[in-house]
Amino acid sequence: MKKALLMVLVVTLLLSSFAFSAPKIRIGVSIPTADHGWTGGINWWAQKAIKEWQAKDPDVTFFLVTADSPAKQVADVEDLMVKGIDALVILAHDSAPLTPIVEKVYNEGIFVVSVDRGLTKPVEHVYVAGDNPGLGRVSAEWMAKELNYKGSIVVLEGIPCVINSERVDAFNEVKKKYPNIKILDSQPAYWSTQKGLEIMENYLQKYDKIDAGKAVRRGREPAP
């Protein structure tokens, strides 16, 4: 939820910067569909921020769109460009598929704020995210200590995107310090409880002994 609050703050700063140069401001906000608790919070805070700003300044127009897939989000951003937006706030559904369209927005001179999952190229003016490498390092050190620095583990990754890579890479880097800890398998569960459950069941059938499992999670949803 802290990232949602940061998103509201970024929009606030963005509006302030435009207020001196444009009588009418159009801001597009593109985020994933509220398909679980964390994205539900993102949607709620985005709607709240929009309502509050429009009550204070009728010259600010927001276009909030949600997408259940990268393809839908690309189409949404294209539609926002047609609407003539001055700025785009985007939480990418997936980093790689969204980078080209966001780069197009950026090259058109539209102010871009990227939130959380990031893009594969620096094609934003502002990037807001948590300490994802830190999350990977802390979880790796904790797990190593709990295992007494030896054992076999499996990993459930998130969606293949920038923040997932940052967390997993940092986790793996710490693991190198402990050669007696072996990573048996690491697969993307796409931050889905159901998908994670399926992969974990396969892990349990495939490997004779698993001492621990690492889940790269989005927020506070239950791990498989």
Where does each model-flagged region fall?
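Positively charged n-region of N-terminal signal peptides that target proteins for export
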Residues: M1-M7
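Bacterial N-terminal signal peptides
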Residues: V8-S16
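A residue-level marker of the well-folded mature domains of exported/periplasmic proteins
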Residues: A4, F20-P224
